[in-house]
């Protein structure tokens, strides 16, 4: 899956899954726009990794929750690279995956739901609104949105987080239906628990062990495991796929 001369925008790319995705695209020859919010040093390290892997990259600080900031980021990418071929919406509101400390439904305020909606759907909305005029003009483009296997099997009911990710699936499929005739594809990748990441740092070892025992492939995903399916959905290998959700959880979703 070569991405030579392709330009890829990855949001939330300074660490974890986003960083792994950025590195993977660069290793296939892509130019990667490494979006981040606060950690400039981490973003710079990802840029260096991308260049060492054989691609090109630069970091752009932008809050995907701000339509103005996102528009400026997309305009900068187009000014510097002349094009955008792929968008990966990976950024989301900070969340702690701790089954023993999660809030029950009666303890979850609507504001908690709204915060996750704003992060998951709002961020993707802003990025898509900013990049779609360019995609329409070129009559091509691929959008990959990162969701969660919890939308299919909420083994732990993280009410606000999972509901927002489910909404992102609906958002993606509606876009896929509307944009397909224009040559623009929209798909989702749904990882299970990914370790190590900042979000999974709160997940206790005993729960991780129980998850491993329930997973047919008998381990937990690493950030690099998520990158491959993202590249597949962004590539010509998946040119006849849109509106799909690929589950990347070692088969756990079957149980």
Q: Model-found features: residue ranges?
A:
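Conserved glycine-rich cofactor-binding loop
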Residues: 7, 14-15
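Alpha-helical segment proximal to the catalytic Tyr-Lys
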Residues: 133, 177-178, 239
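Substrate-binding pocket helix/loop in short-chain dehydrogenase/reductase
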Residues: 97-117, 200, 211
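Catalytic Tyr-X3-Lys loop
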Residues: 85, 106-125, 140, 144, ...
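Conserved glycine-rich Rossmann-like NAD(P)H-binding loop of the short-chain dehydrogenase/reductase
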Residues: 28-45
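Active-site helix of classical SDR
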Residues: 128, 164, 172
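Active-site loop-to-helix junction immediately N-terminal to the catalytic Tyr of the SDR YXXXK motif
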Residues: 100-101, 154-163, 174
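Short, small/polar-rich loop/turn modules that mediate ligand/substrate recognition or access, typified
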Residues: 180, 185, 241-243, 249
């Amino acid at each position: 899956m070569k991405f030579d001369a392709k330009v890829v925008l990855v949001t939330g790319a300074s660490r974890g899954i986003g960083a792994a995705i950025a590195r993977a695209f660069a290793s296939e020859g892509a130019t990667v726009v490494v979006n981040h919010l606060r950690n400039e040093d981490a973003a710079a390290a990802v840029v260096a990794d991308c260049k060492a892997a054989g691609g090109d990259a630069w970091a752009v600080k932008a809050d995907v929750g701000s339509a103005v900031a996102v528009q400026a980021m997309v305009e900068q990418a187009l000014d510097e690279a002349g094009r955008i071929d792929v968008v990966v919406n990976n950024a989301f509101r900070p969340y702690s995956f701790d089954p023993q400390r999660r809030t029950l439904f009666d303890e979850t305020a609507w504001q908690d739901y709204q915060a996750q909606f704003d992060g998951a759907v709002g961020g993707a909305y802003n990025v898509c609104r900013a990049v779609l005029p360019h995609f329409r003009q070129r009559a091509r483009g691929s959008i990959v949105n990162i969701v969660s296997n919890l939308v299919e099997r909420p083994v732990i009911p993280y009410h606000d987080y999972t509901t927002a990710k489910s909404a992102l699936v609906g958002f993606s499929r509606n876009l896929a239906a509307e944009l397909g005739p224009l040559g623009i594809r929209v798909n989702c990748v749904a990882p299970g628990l990914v370790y190590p990441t900042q979000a999974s740092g709160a997940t206790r070892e005993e729960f991780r062990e129980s998850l491993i025992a329930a997973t047919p492939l008998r381990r937990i995903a690493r950030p690099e495991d998520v990158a491959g399916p993202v590249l597949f959905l962004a590539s010509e290998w998946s040119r006849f796929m849109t509106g799909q959700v690929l589950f990347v959880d070692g088969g756990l979703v079957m149980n």
